[in-house]
From Swiss-Prot:
It comes from Bovine coronavirus (strain Ontario) (BCoV). The lineage of its organism: Viruses, Riboviria, Orthornavirae, Pisuviricota, Pisoniviricetes. The active site is at residues 40, 326, 329. The gene is HE. Residues 17-392 are virion surface. It is found in: Virion membrane; Host cell membrane. This is Hemagglutinin-esterase.
């Protein structure tokens, strides 16, 4: 074992002078069991319908268009489809999930429920929503949308209370006040049902502030009650502000079952759509590519806030988004990030994707897959090598055995040669 320190030293020298395996700023996959969710920057169908076809519109390599591993829609996002009438049924399945969408609901759209509302609250909602999506897609293979049927026994219909520009909220639905109620101080209920999926992401939302109607202020109060298990989920307004508040949403992960939506004050809300989560899998971190505009439009960082290790790896370009088709489509930096989908890679980490699994100049943080076992850690004065000890000990033993064999062979031939000279 006296050879081990020398072996480590030699390995350090060889590693520092020769082979390098740095993490690369791409999204990739271990094998063919992967899926990408996106928008126009990866929507092959959108390019096909343009005349003439111009694949520079996308950041995705066109070679992946026929892979069957992409669910993307120009002008949309999973969050936008979840809450609003502008809907696309994102559907996909894979062990390794990649997201490159979210830009189609940003401060640039300036959405708020009412004229005195707050877009900041909707950015907060976006972050909370994607946190649940990313966490759950690290343990589920399949994502799609399902409609949530509900039964309300009153005569009032759902109302488009929350809308701004072209966006109209329809999840959750608002049930209008019954004609025989003089104000909003009343209790009302509706049944809804979740079936067919392993789990569901559903919204539970309230106006967190004093809601003014006909000179009266109301505190919002909403609950969901699982009639099968007895579990209740609820939110009550706690803020005393009268302006600058908006629709605060929590995103619940619920099992199948029969539920009761309950409002104790203001309007009843009931979920109409849910993210359907199916097919449990071994924990596999998702990968998220930053989805933002050119700097001429205001973007947000909510997907970055939502994407945290160990369940998520975040990839971003260091420069402004500048497309070649137009300023918001076909950026070289993001095209480079997506180029990793063209090949398999053995190791993923917070710093990036490793192309090889032997050694690297960077120790992988939050590693997943077959990752490098060694790294050069450079201090200001002395380079130090840190290794996973088991393979190094094993290699040291093999090297020691090899040296012993060589020494034995040398001694054998030296003795044999001496005997021959003596005989001569």
């Amino acid at each position: 074992m006296f050879l081990l320190p020398r072996f480590v030293l030699v390995s350090c020298i060889i590693g520092s002078l020769g082979f390098d395996n740095p993490p690369t700023n791409v999204v990739s996959h271990l094998n063919g069991d992967w899926f990408l969710f996106g928008d126009s920057r990866s929507d092959c169908n959108h390019v096909v319908t343009t005349n003439p076809r111009n694949y520079s519109y996308m950041d995705l390599n066109p070679a992946l268009c026929g892979s069957g591993k992409i669910s993307s829609k120009a002008g949309n996002s999973i969050f936008r489809s979840f809450h609003f009438t502008d809907f696309y049924n994102y559907t996909g399945e894979g062990q390794q999930i990649i997201f490159y969408e979210g830009v189609n609901f940003t401060p640039y759209h300036a959405f708020k429920c009412t004229t005195s509302g707050s877009n900041d609250i909707w950015m907060q909602n976006k972050g909370l929503f994607y946190t649940q999506v990313y966490k759950n897609m690290a343990v589920y293979r399949s994502l799609t949308f399902v409609n949530v049927p509900y039964v309300y026994n009153g005569s009032a219909q759902s109302t488009a209370l929350c809308k701004s520009g072209s966006l109209v909220l329809n999840n959750p639905a608002y049930i209008a006040r019954e004609a025989n109620f003089g104000d909003y101080y009343y209790k009302v209920e509706a049944d809804f049902y979740l079936s067919g999926c392993d789990e569901y992401i559903v919204p539970l939302c309230i106006f967190n502030g004093k809601f003014l109607s006909n000179t009266k202020y109301y505190d919002d109060s909403q609950y969901y009650f699982n009639k099968d298990t007895g579990v209740i989920y609820g939110l009550n307004s706690t803020e005393t502000i009268t302006t600058g508040f908006d629709f605060n949403c929590h995103y619940l992960v619920l099992p199948s079952g029969n539920y009761l939506a309950i409002s104790n004050e203001l309007l009843l809300t009931v979920p109409t759509k849910a993210i359907c989560l199916n097919k449990r899998k071994d924990f596999t971190p998702v990968q998220v590519v930053d989805s933002r505009w050119n700097n001429a439009r205001q973007s947000d960082n909510m997907t970055a806030v939502a994407c945290q290790p160990p369940y998520c790896y975040f990839r971003n370009s260091t420069t402004n988004y500048v497309g070649v088709y137009d300023i918001n489509h076909g950026d070289a930096g993001f095209t480079s990030i997506l180029s990793g989908l063209l090949y398999d890679s053995p190791c993923f980490s917070q710093q990036g994707v490793f192309r090889y699994d032997n050694v690297s100049s960077v120790w992988p943080l939050y590693p997943y897959g077959r990752c490098p076992t060694a790294a050069d850690i450079n201090t200001p004065d002395v380079p130090i090598c840190v290794y996973d000890p088991l393979p190094i000990i094993f290699l040291g033993i093999l090297l020691g055995v090899a040296v012993i064999i060589i020494v034995v062979l040398l001694l054998y031939f030296m003795v044999d040669n001496g005997t021959r000279l003596h005989d001569a």
